[in-house]
Amino acid sequence: MRDKIKLQSTESAYFYTTDKNKRNMAGKFEIKKYDPVLRKHVLFKEAKIK
């Protein structure tokens, strides 16, 4: 089952939305992605979509 998640930047208020397969990826998701607010790559962490 694929659930919608929010990837929140650790250094600004910018976020991406995506989905993840909870059966294959247990735990919180973390990835380095481009943050257009800061114009550099930063760590994004999984957060709940409200």
UniProtKB/Swiss-Prot annotation:
GO cellular component, one term: cytosolic large ribosomal subunit
InterPro entries (alphabetical): Ribosomal_bL33 (IPR001705), Ribosomal_bL33_CS (IPR018264), Ribosomal_bL33_sf (IPR038584), Ribosomal_zn-bd (IPR011332)
Entry keywords, A to Z: Ribonucleoprotein, Ribosomal protein
Gene Ontology biological process terms in this record: translation
GO MF annotation, one: structural constituent of ribosome
A Pfam family hit: Ribosomal_L33
Entry-linked NCBIfam families: PRK00595.1, rpmG_bact
Family affiliation: Belongs to the bacterial ribosomal protein bL33 family.
PANTHER family in UniProt: 54S RIBOSOMAL PROTEIN L39, MITOCHONDRIAL (PTHR15238), LARGE RIBOSOMAL SUBUNIT PROTEIN BL33M (PTHR15238:SF1)
Protein name from the UniProt record: Large ribosomal subunit protein bL33
Organism taxonomic ancestry: Bacteria, Pseudomonadati, Pseudomonadota, Gammaproteobacteria, Thiotrichales
